[in-house]
Amino acid sequence: WIMGHMVNAIYQIQEFVALGANSIEFDINFDTDANPIYTYHGVPCDCFRSCLHYEYFSDFLKALREHTLPGNPKYKENLVLFVFDLKTNSLYDSQAYAAGQKLAENIFQYYWANGEGMPVSGYLVLSIPNLQHYDLIKGFRETIKAKGHSELLNRVGYDFSANDNIPDVENAYKKVGIVNHVWQSDGITNCISRGLTRAKEAVSERDGGGVINKVYVWTIDKYQSMRDALDAGVDGIMTNYPDVLVEVLKEDAYKDRFRLARNYDDPFETFKV
């Protein structure tokens, strides 16, 4: 999975897909009442990137729908996976459930069109930066189920993104009954070098049949760093330069071992690489 990083403006969706991304990540900010309001990263962010792009959340979700709705003029066949980087650290722990509810309400209305009409082809990963906010998952799932559309949860996965100890992450999932659809991230801003020790631990847990189904690293922009991540067996690389990863995947060491995920692939199915 080539995961385009910090795609917070609608016009950037097409830009990153054109560069080769089959997945995009964006930052979701909440107000003091736990409502998701807009996509925005802010300063500081990755080196050599603009940090200030933003859209209202409802408008961004509508754009995601257009890009993953077969028959729509803006439909992008190979755009498959969306990573919602949920900036919940601005909230109290007690607000996590409400944040999940309100996130579900927005996605159900603006991306899934209230469960009506032609289904969209995108899959979602809810990426949470705080292990204490596990109730966000519960709030999200219970809200979708209450709307009579539990089948939509087949298209939703989860990630805790704070580089916590893997056993602690697994315990958080146990608290809300999650046993699959788990992506595990590992990383740091592209301005700083980070080793792959924890990423390799996550890969081992994936291959050992644990709760982790997929592993991705962020934010990786250099050719050699991408090669190192692929050698470690990750499923996805989040990058500011999808075209660089496209070129790396064409190299002899990787062209027969990896292929780009397509819209017929299940982003929650475990592969041992």
UniProtKB/Swiss-Prot annotation:
Expressed in which tissues: Expressed by the venom gland.
Gene3D superfamilies from the UniProt entry: Phosphatidylinositol (PI) phosphodiesterase
Keyword Disulfide bond annotated: yes
Record GO terms (molecular function): lyase activity; metal ion binding; phosphoric diester hydrolase activity; toxin activity
Pfam families: GDPD_2
Disulfide bonds: C45-C51, C47-C191
Documented EC number(s): 4.6.1.-
One Gene Ontology term, aspect cellular component: extracellular region
Cofactor note as given: Binds 1 Mg(2+) ion per subunit.
GO biological process, alphabetically ordered: killing of cells of another organism; lipid catabolic process
Reaction(s) the record says it catalyses: an N-(acyl)-sphingosylphosphocholine = an N-(acyl)-sphingosyl-1,3-cyclic phosphate + choline; an N-(acyl)-sphingosylphosphoethanolamine = an N-(acyl)-sphingosyl-1,3-cyclic phosphate + ethanolamine; a 1-acyl-sn-glycero-3-phosphocholine = a 1-acyl-sn-glycero-2,3-cyclic phosphate + choline; a 1-acyl-sn-glycero-3-phosphoethanolamine = a 1-acyl-sn-glycero-2,3-cyclic phosphate + ethanolamine
Family in the record: Belongs to the arthropod phospholipase D family. Class II subfamily.
Name this protein carries in UniProt: Dermonecrotic toxin LarSicTox-alphaII1
Species this chain originates from: Loxosceles arizonica (Arizona brown spider)
